[in-house]
Amino acid sequence: MYRKEFNIKKYRPLIEQIFDALELVFTHGKMADQALETVMKKNKKWTVYDRSFVAETFYEIIRNWRFLWTIIGKEPEMKRHFLWEILGTSLVLKEEKLPGVYLFKNVIPHKIEEKAEKYKKVRALRESVPDWLDKLGEKEIGKGWTSILAALNNPPKLILRTNTLKTNTEILQSKLKEEGVETVAIDFVSDALELPFNRNVFRTIPFHDGWFEVQDAASQVVAHYMDVQPGMRVVDACAGAGGKSLHIAALMKNKGKLLAMDNKEWKLKELNRRAARAGAGVIETRLIDSSKVFKRLEGSADRLLLDVPCSGTGVLRRNPDIKWKLQQEELDRLKIIQAEILDEYCIMTKVGGKMIYVTCSILPSEGEEQVAAFIKKHSEFKLLDQLRLSPDKEGYDGFYLAMIERIS
């Protein structure tokens, strides 16, 4: 049963911008979020509904990219006639009624539905992943791969983390409601709020005032897992733009010292900007420009967080273009980097202190296997605990966390 006819006249200008964004991703190699931001900045007069339509349609096409072009029966290309066919196929699968215009002349609903039923039986096609990644997932994860992959192909939830340095969850909920943003508290992790309906929260007064950050619930688990206390000396050695550093600072109640490090200066500048907005005065940033940085900090950290570069397979829901950018060679390179980071950075942990190894990957070769190899090589460390957060069980991003104590 089809819904009302798709309004091509209303949406065509928006669709052309979606196609521009897709070209940025698949031809020019831009990350999906960057491509979307590019077209959003060019169209500042768009309404909230325009922006929502563009974002949802753009990500839906990327998420189902292989399934869509397999149904069409053509190799992917960035020519407009192909993209209109892709869009039309996507609309039919959502039970939208297509208008009788030349743009959709090759889109025949009953044929699309027949092919969709056929190709849904093939997991790699149904979930739109490359064959090599599907085979790797099955090899590493086994029977659980099918349900994990299905969960990773769903749209992500929008989760906020309350900045407890400035407010609490109840007050934040109330203030957001005043601006028309409905939220619900979740049991999975404290101080987190979920938005049942997507809204542009970045234009709200609470965001401007540093009362919250957008951060997936699984990512929020990391700082809690570290068991940081006020007054500790903590090092976040792969801090990036500081999402986890800000959370750690809040749990430390701005008491002690939190050293946020990264090898990219522009990320640390962004971290400093975010820390100022959040009121996280305990954070100090430091650029990793040589291995001497680690030697100077040897044996100093009560807690050392290693949120290492990884495949990102645990966050495919919010970064679905990773499926088409990641290659086996890149994964192999990342695993070498992960092992090197463990070997080089671990010296910053003091005896009796704890190192927390984290990846947003669902692959054991980037998680459990890396930690096992490290422990075998370093007798001065002991594995205390491991935690695997799975998208098909908790309903959030996929993460691996390990708590490792330095014993000598």
Regions found by a protein language model. Name each.
Residues 1-408:
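S-adenosylmethionine
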